[in-house]
């Protein structure tokens, strides 16, 4: 279906090497055959409680992204997401703290914050055009997913350097009294 849409909307005949999908809990409720090569849940918060009877119901919907046998990319800072880890499953973690050997996280060196893979610094946080811990966490998740897919590091870092964020997100509206 996506190939047809690409052909009709964008006049693209070649099949893409991969698809990047952002799926809501609503969409995941009706997803039965997804077997993503890599998937992540960035965090869990009590959203959409008008739709779900309990937080556990919401978590169960989000957990559906991990059906299949692909790499799980999980937020080590969120205990609910960490509880989704399946024994024996290939997984990468990301954290705003210092990462373990094969995980992604932040390293503090020389007075600077670095996005890192294990002990290896990949990109300085100051090189990014986005701000906020949530954006650093998202960038770490993206790097972990790209790494799991075997994407070239320089391509991923170039994309992060160029990314300006979404319109109206973390935009200064007014400064008052200082």
Positions of predicted regions on the chain:
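Acidic, Mg2+-coordinating active-site environments of NTP-dependent enzymes
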Residues: 3-16, 36-37, 41-178
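ATP-dependent NMP and nucleoside kinases share a basic, alpha-helical "lid"
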Residues: 31-35
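Carbohydrate-associated surface elements
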Residues: 28
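Acidic, glycine-rich active-site loops and adjacent beta-strand->loop/helix elements
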Residues: 1-2, 25
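Switch II (G3) loop of P-loop NTPases
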Residues: 17-25
